[in-house]
Amino acid sequence: MEAWKGGKGMEAFWGRYQKEIELSLLTLEEEKVISRLWKKDHTLWKPYPQEIVDRLGWLNIPQEMQKNVAQLENMTDELIKEGFQEALLLGMGGSSLAPQLFQKIWGNKEGFLNLHVLDSTDPEMVNHYAQSLDPHKTLYLVSTKSGRTLETLSFLKFFYNLVQKKIGEKAGRQFIAITDPGSPLVRWGEQYGFRKVFLSPPDIGGRYSAFSFFGLVPAALLGIDLSLLLEKATIAS
């Protein structure tokens, strides 16, 4: 059986599924699916654009986020100078997946913050971070696209009360929120004096948000080269 030959010398053997897969690839090529996707052509899915064109922001987010690199790097430098050593991300699903991936790939870089991700309501895990992290040296990242995720808001209430008992009226300075414009979390951030509220583009789904603020804020705290990361993502696109 002959191998399928793709671009850049790629070859693949698909066994008994080869004919079906080759036919599907040919159909994708004939219908210009890739080029239409990058043009955000909603007719790839449905004849009407509702709930499609406003979910394709991930296609060009690597280019769009380049202008925010300096801001994120300056914020990280400021946090390090203030003595922050740990970062605890409070989030579920798409809001936590990219940070977890970045941490596993790059690890905790010396001289930057150690990143921890709390994406479980297991009482033992919540208590572990409550007991092991010093609130004076910990930055809490509250990450939810909708600003209504019950688990994340429960984490926020728990850890805010914990930090407030230890630090007092300036507890909000230990918190950063990442959310969509207009979400309830924006009001929370203003009310409780959060250090910063990052507003991510609303046309990106949670699981496609790796190169938005949801992924890049934690990446900056880890000391990852954001310019290089976004450059490589842009090339890949």
Question: Which role does the model predict for each range below?
Answer:
Residues 2-80:
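Extended, charge-enriched "interface" segments that sit outside catalytic cores
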Residues 77-237:
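Glycine-rich phosphate-binding loops that contact phosphosugars or nucleotide phosphates
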